[in-house]
Amino acid sequence: MSDTEKSSASTSRRSLLKQSALALAGAGLYGAAPFYGPWKHNHAWAQTAQKKPLVIGLTMDASGQYAASGGEERLGAVMAIKEFNDKGGVLGRRIEAIHMDTETTPATGSRVAERMISRNEAAFLIGAVHSGVSNAISQVAQKYGTIFLNTNSSSPTEAGKDCHRTKFVWDGNGSNFSQAIVRNAMKTSGRNWVLLTNDYVWGHNTSKATRAVIEANGGRVVEELLVPQNTRDFSAYLLKLQQIKPNAVATAVGGDDIKALRQQVVQLKMHQGAAWINNQQDWPDVYGLGQDAIFGVFGTTWYYRLDLPGVKEFVAAYQKQFPGMAIRVPGNVYHNAYMATRELLRCVEEAGTTQNIAVIKKLEGRRMTALDRMQHHDAWIDPVTHQCQQTIYMASYNDKPAEKDDIFKILSQADPREVMDKEATGACKLESYEATPSYEA
């Protein structure tokens, strides 16, 4: 790339910020006062010897369908940031985290991302559970060249057709879980399946992956029932299931919806008939539901009682930092956010700069040991799709708990090499480095 092209790329983010600032001010979105953006704030730092803080925007739900998971992933990111700040920050700069509620709504996610980048000058964005929200945030992030860590949303499209050079996906996706969970369930559950699907991008693409595994192994999907988000009364769907009498029900339902579904299935004693397979079960969605409601087989990426080095210390650190929490022990959502944030900050340190392209190149292809991540297999970031390939666990309710919170029984684990989403590799077309705006925070 020529010097002229480099200059153009490095200034493109500043130009976008300026244009965005003028547009927002003109529209009156921040009131009648002129919009000064981050420059007014940074002017004060320029007058002192102290380095300005490194701002990280936490784009996590505090309301809506995934509020509980949003709260847990926020704690995970905050813990990783605290550990770095306790050691002096990163590159001699204290890390400042700002949070805005993305409300489990794509439009809100987009507005939050725009505001954090253009007004708060966030160097990085972290967080998402709802895949539609993650996609919306990532489009804004790519426009500015801002690195965005999708910590917990798991539609296969996130590292597939909706991938971006600046986006890194840290959770297992629907295809990974389907390959690990459904294939095994086919051996004991029978041929006729019904799919119960949350009617949005994650649900659709997760059930698509589940259907592919079922049919590839000689099974048949006799019906797919689409469930609108924020459904609380599942009686019509459960009546339909009673009429169909499938061998197995595969659910791609999440957040508060899966809590309501589980409770109503138990009330009708329908968990005692067909086999229930939940593609992925996030810890905040079942914590505190009670023994009967945690039926079936499901996937996860981490559990607080894995017999691995570092796990007990990790749990103790959570309880010390966040005493009195309703969720007394960390789960997969917290673990994903912590690991993502920690690796990002490690990459900044290794790069010796916050320059986005340099940090992106440190993240791409990054390998992380099983010991370091407290899992059974090494993990890595696929340089083609930017998804973290990690251990996938199959679990069920633990009928012999060692303590009150010990509600999962880990049945098996899958090596990430065995459950990779091969379709994502073909669907993902990352933007070039040259087409990605360059900046140094």
Over which residues does each language-model region extend?
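Sec-dependent signal peptide hydrophobic core
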Residues: S20-G28
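Extracytosolic ligand-binding ectodomains
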Residues: S2-K6, T11-A21, A33-A441
